[in-house]
């Protein structure tokens, strides 16, 4: 059934004319997907909160993309007083210039009352689970949604159906209140998460889940794939000319989230870590056989079987779950609901929440158990380290130690900035936020060419970054080993405290070569990789753990994470912690790959449309945007997408 719908989607794609150069996106232009972002009071974790929502809900609709095809996604900023951007998390190397959605790095944000058309080109090998989110302030807490790239033909793993499980944090403070506290000289922390949401539904510690009605909708509409679209006001309509998208049903009562399944089937569970703070550990009651087949999209891995999942902010895991047969359910007393239990880790105020795996729509949704359904492991540091390897090892392009040309250490420090009196996070002794520049770096390079480029020689003697521009330069095709080195806090209010960080790279995937306690020792880690015969898979988000008891002497090394990357995608890209509060406090870096000639790929006559805030590439009620079409409409997946049978690979 899934592939028959894909064939319909493919036929619509192939009917689009081939464009080239600059076009006016007037009423004749029909984008493939539309996202309208606004502000609304949302029933979140059984409480009300003002959230930034997408098409009326948080999370927003699940966007399904065909691999090997160009896609246009129109993003409207319907907010009155806030800028907006949209980042396509994990789809590295797959978007046109000025489309990465990072305001300080690659594009001006979308002004209130305007829209921007994002151009994305997927490749056949991009099949996997991703997500989109705003890259402005704390908006990504709620302004987010799933982004699924379908398989080009058959998946290498058989499954009958799939379910999306997107996790978010719930905070009682408003986005603005949290930002003000983080950036004040009288530092005020955001507070800990007050609830974990699964597909928009969860329970705050101040509330209690009640029993739900039989058949109540929850999560994304699996049966409405490619046909449902929810307008900005929350109403549903078909949008005949626009691909449809799954969307959650907003909660109307305080019940647990539900994952509906049928007996005796294999489900592909797409776990998405859209949390802005929390690292989660989770497992299913009486379902201990979970097979991880893909991590962070992009590449299938050799199967790894576990009994629980660990999910940090920005990470994704695709997991095969074999449900119980009808006979097994009968032998288990006709039990048709089982709890999914999830708990936060490495935070001072832990949270435990539940979802429900339900086998029968006629079964009422149970309330949360009074005692834990599972005992989940407390330690997170060694979960599946040095484990994930390619499904096809011969095709691995993971750089060896001998190929590494340079090592950059990003030492993570928390301290008071003497210039501002604010508490900040630093990487490699430098702090960066969206306020560090008066214009995006990519715009500056297009305008001034080599004069805007960072000094490579100066960076070599200054922790990897140029002191004049605060940018990390990399030569095209050089092989870097990037090490994030965790240390104890210098802040008197948290002296020696060590935090766990999810680190994410834009622009291209990296090969994760491990982690460990203390200070990074490249010789020891290379020996470990050799002894294991380990060839890592491509990743875009991995964890830097705190190790030990989470406290060392101020500035003392506490743990590390190492990546290897061949810098083969010229452009301007971010590497940053994916905890939103830490980003606002400066835990971000900007990398410039290649020289100006490599980066400037759009003619000046049209690229200048992107140079100003609210310029001609941004549409509004009175102006149709003038947009450069970077990719053509050649579909690299035509034969595979149209030729497979319905049941192949699923």
Swiss-Prot record:
Claim: Magnesium is one of the keywords in the record: no
Coiled coil ranges: none
Regulation: Retains almost half of its activity in presence of high salt concentrations up to 100 mM NaCl. Retains also more than 85% of its original activity in the presence of 1 mM EDTA, indicating a satisfactory resistance towards chelators, which is rare among metal-containing enzyme. The activity drops significantly in the presence of NaN(3) or SDS. Appears more active in the presence of methanol compared to ethanol, but acetone or DMSO addition severely affect remaining laccase activity.
Positions bound to Cu cation 2: 89, 133, 578
Broad EC category: oxidoreductase
The reaction(s) this protein catalyses: 2 2',3,4-trihydroxy-trans-chalcone + O2 + 2 H(+) = 2 3',4'-dihydroxyaurone + 2 H2O
Application notes: The thermophilic yellow LMCO1 presents a number of superior properties with potential use in industrial biocatalysis via its ability to oxidize a variety of phenolic compounds.
Pfam families, per database record: Cu-oxidase, Cu-oxidase_2, Cu-oxidase_3
Sites where the protein binds Cu cation 1: 87, 504
Every Plastocyanin-like domain range: 41-151, 162-360, 439-595
GO molecular function: copper ion binding; oxidoreductase activity
Signal peptide range: 1-20
Residues at which Cu cation 4 binds: 501, 577, 582
Record flagged with keyword RNA-binding: no
Homology family: Belongs to the multicopper oxidase family.
Name of this protein: Laccase-like multicopper oxidase 1
Species this protein is from: Thermothelomyces thermophilus (strain ATCC 42464 / BCRC 31852 / DSM 1799) (Sporotrichum thermophile)
Taxonomic classification: Eukaryota, Fungi, Dikarya, Ascomycota, Pezizomycotina
